[in-house]
């Protein structure tokens, strides 16, 4: 019986944007009673060795090679076909997608059945259904690798280490609970052989919920206010289950002794001098919530092995390319490109900055393999996923993406053009700064800077009011008395600061009166389509941040999505949305008799 085929809406949009004749590999998740969900693809080079195996190691465990995609009249796919088919493990029926260039019209999906193609229908899985049906695990563990500083030795010792990992001696634990999972399954009596991943999720409180489950070690938590929490990844709606790793003293599933940390596993070979390299692994897996909990152990082992393969690749590449004979320490980074709808992992070496030639080359190669533009950062360190709820002592951060969940603007036949990516909402009185009445433009600047940080363009800290004033004095825009004062700034000063702090250029747009703001609706729409950055608007009145427009070309009706920095209350999303501090505003919001200047930051070309 052929698998039931579903395709992620994220993947379909990526396929539609591909406008070059080429072929690539498809990656998907096989789950339930014979359903194949296609989630991702890569572009294969027409020359040299295929790269799908290395790409698969970057994906969460369970996201596996399952077929081939051909774009246009590409003939490269014929050469790749046999090799790819032989490498597909998750199904006996590899899949072939045939796409026209730049369109989904005519998209055909076929399974290989006894060497012949059989065309099949498919269902589209939208984002909300993905978030409802699937979750991720994020596992953290450490090992020591003892190896000579040669590619051959690293490959050999990594192979041995992976075998040790898979020997059945590891035990997994949900942090701060007594939920342990070994190679026989979960050790907690509340779970049975029929238990599913969702049953595990149900006993883990969400971030911010101060409750303990029956499985929480109450002695350990006595006197603490740190209940176990699911992790909330920034900018997406997947739930992420945290996992720790331990070693079992016994393979006996009923052993009464608790496991102990796995951080001392080492691989040694006394015939050669060895360098000890610490390996701090962070590994991910994707799971259908209805997956049997009994399968979790094997999935987590595979996620560790994928992380180790990424480390191996990064170490060997560096040794081969640099010729230095020096081993650097690798680290795991997880990325969530908004276009993908799933995580991608990379291993970067400490001591190599993002701007070293080898790092630039690797990222450029990744962009090409994933059909991503070489003009925006996706895999710089600053792009790495942040997991909320990970630590109790995490530094304060403002609310993220406060416009999500707002009701529609009400513009008839309008089209929304919104900020592209993540931002933080900065407003009056945050960080104990008494800036009510004068700090609105400073707060708008901070919101804009947060966008560039969260999109991976920079690691620079968000500038404070004082730092802004000191910089404007430094470039002779303001007198010395301005530093430490309560004087406001405008759009021009914002553009100067963006250039000075972030090396970001801005476009300044002048509007003679609030009544004329409707005339620039199309220009704002184009800005959000091409640049996607928040826009600061000031002039003769108070400053605000525009993060979107809803515009009907036929009627000219427009509403502006405003982030208001004048809010002075607590960071409560419901209050901010209900009271309109983040919301859609019509033309009556603007002062008809006042002029306005808009600072429209431009994305730098960076990857």
Curated annotation (Swiss-Prot):
Database matches in PANTHER family: UFM1-SPECIFIC PROTEASE 2
A single MF term (Gene Ontology): deUFMylase activity
Pfam families: Peptidase_C78, UfSP2_N
UniProt protein name: Probable Ufm1-specific protease 2
EC number: 3.4.22.-
Source species of the chain: Drosophila melanogaster
Active site: 440, 564, 566
Record InterPro entries: Papain-like_cys_pep_sf, UfSP1/2_DUB_cat, UfSP2-like_N
Protein keywords: Hydrolase, Protease, Thiol protease, Ubl conjugation pathway
Keyword Protease: yes
SUPFAM superfamilies per the UniProt record, alphabetical: Cysteine proteinases
Biological role: Thiol protease which recognizes and hydrolyzes the peptide bond at the C-terminal Gly of UFM1, a ubiquitin-like modifier protein bound to a number of target proteins. Does not hydrolyze SUMO1 or ISG15 ubiquitin-like proteins.
Origin superkingdom: Eukaryota
Membership in a protein family: Belongs to the peptidase C78 family.
Biological process (GO), any one: proteolysis
Cellular component per GO, a single term: endomembrane system
Gene: Ufsp2
Signal peptide from the UniProt entry: none
Keyword Nucleus found: no
């Amino acid at each position: 019986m052929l698998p039931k085929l579903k395709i992620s809406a994220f993947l379909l949009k990526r396929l539609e944007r591909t406008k070059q004749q080429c072929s690539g590999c498809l990656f998907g998740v096989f789950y339930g009673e014979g359903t194949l969900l296609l989630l991702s693809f890569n572009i294969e080079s027409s020359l040299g060795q295929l790269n799908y195996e290395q790409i698969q190691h970057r994906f969460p465990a369970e996201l596996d090679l399952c077929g081939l995609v051909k774009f246009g009249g590409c003939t490269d796919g014929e050469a790749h076909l046999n090799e790819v088919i032989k490498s597909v493990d998750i199904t006996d029926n590899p899949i072939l997608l045939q796409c026209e260039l730049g369109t989904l019209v005519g998209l055909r999906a076929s399974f290989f059945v006894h060497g012949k193609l059989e065309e099949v229908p498919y269902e589209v899985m939208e984002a909300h259904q993905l978030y409802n049906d699937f979750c991720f695990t994020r596992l953290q563990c450490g090992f020591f690798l003892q190896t000579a500083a040669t590619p051959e030795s690293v490959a050999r010792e990594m192979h041995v280490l992976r075998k040790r990992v898979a020997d059945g001696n590891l035990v997994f634990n949900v942090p701060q609970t007594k939920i342990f999972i070994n190679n026989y399954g979960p050790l907690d009596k509340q779970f049975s052989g029929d238990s599913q991943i969702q049953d595990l999720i149900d006993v883990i409180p969400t971030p911010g919920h101060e409750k303990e489950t029956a499985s929480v070690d109450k002695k350990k938590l006595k006197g603490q206010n740190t209940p176990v929490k699911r992790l909330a990844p920034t900018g997406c709606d997947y739930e992420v289950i945290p996992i720790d790793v331990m070693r079992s003293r016994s393979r006996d599933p009923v052993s009464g002794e608790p496991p102990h940390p796995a951080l001392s596993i080492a691989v040694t070979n006394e015939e050669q001098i060895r360098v000890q390299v610490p390996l701090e692994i962070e590994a991910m897996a994707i799971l259908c919530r209805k997956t049997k909990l009994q399968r979790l152990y094997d999935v987590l082992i595979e996620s560790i092995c994928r992380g180790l393969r990424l480390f191996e690749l990064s170490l060997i590449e560096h040794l081969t390319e640099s010729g230095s004979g020096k081993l650097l320490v690798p680290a795991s980074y997880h990325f969530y490109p908004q276009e993908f709808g799933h995580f991608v992992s990379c291993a970067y070496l400490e001591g190599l900055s993002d701007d070293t030639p080898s790092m630039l080359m690797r990222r450029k190669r990744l962009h090409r393999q994933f059909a991503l533009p070489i003009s925006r950062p996706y895999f710089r360190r600053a792009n790495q996923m942040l997991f909320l709820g990970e630590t109790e002592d995490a530094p304060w951060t403002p609310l993220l993406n406060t416009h999500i969940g707002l009701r529609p603007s009400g513009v008839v036949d309008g089209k929304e053009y919104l900020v592209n990516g993540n931002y933080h909402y900065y407003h009056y009185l945050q960080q104990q700064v008494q800036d009510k009445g004068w700090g609105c433009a400073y707060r708008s600047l901070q919101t804009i800077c947060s966008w560039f940080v969260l999109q991976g363009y920079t690691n620079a800290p968000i500038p404070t009011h004082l730092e802004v004033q000191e910089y404007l004095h430094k470039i002779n825009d303001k007198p010395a008395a301005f530093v430490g004062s309560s004087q406001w700034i405008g759009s021009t000063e914002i553009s100067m600061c963006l250039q000075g702090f972030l090396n970001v250029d801005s476009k300044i747009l002048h509007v003679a009166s609030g009544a004329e703001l409707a005339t620039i609706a199309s220009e704002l729409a184009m800005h959000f389509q091409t640049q996607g950055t928040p826009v600061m608007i000031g002039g003769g009145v108070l400053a605000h941040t525009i993060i979107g427009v809803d515009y009907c070309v036929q009627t000219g009706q427009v509403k502006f999505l405003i982030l208001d920095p004048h809010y002075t209350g607590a960071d409560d999303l419901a209050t901010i949305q209900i009271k309109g501090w983040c919301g859609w505003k019509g033309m009556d919001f603007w002062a008809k008799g006042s002029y306005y200047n808009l600072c429209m930051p431009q994305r730098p070309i960076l990857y």
